[in-house]
């Protein structure tokens, strides 16, 4: 692992740094596009199961994580993939928002919904 002082001692030229930047951007693009495709897949399944109730209205997708929060290019790649796959019209209703502690909240909601359907209250 490099410390900030170690980076000063690393010799590199501009060409090598540009290549590293391109490789990193390619990896981030792939990750964002895969995440976007995953979101679209889930939304399409929900649309199929609800017989057309999802894409006709506003749908909010909560994203948790530092990459989405702190890396604007990742967020752009993800949203571009959703727009590309769904098309401009359907994607207008899909809103992707950052959330803190999404996994804890999601687990709580899942447990609550499971309890609701598990028992007739």
Language-model-derived ranges and their functions:
Residues 1-121:
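ATP-binding/phosphotransfer module of carbohydrate and carboxylate kinases, centering on a glycine-rich
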């Amino acid at each position: 692992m490099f410390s900030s002082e170690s980076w000063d001692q690393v010799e590199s030229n501009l060409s090598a740094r540009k290549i590293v930047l391109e490789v990193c951007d390619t990896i981030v693009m792939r990750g964002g596009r895969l995440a976007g495709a995953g979101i679209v897949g889930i939304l399409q399944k929900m649309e199929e199961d609800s017989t057309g109730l999802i894409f006709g209205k506003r749908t909010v997708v909560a994203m948790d994580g530092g990459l989405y929060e702190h890396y604007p290019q990742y967020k752009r790649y993800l949203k571009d993939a959703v727009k590309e796959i769904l098309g401009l019209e359907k994607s207008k209703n899909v809103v992707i928002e950052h959330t803190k502690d999404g996994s804890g909240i999601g687990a709580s909601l899942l447990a609550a919904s499971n309890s609701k359907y598990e028992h007739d209250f």
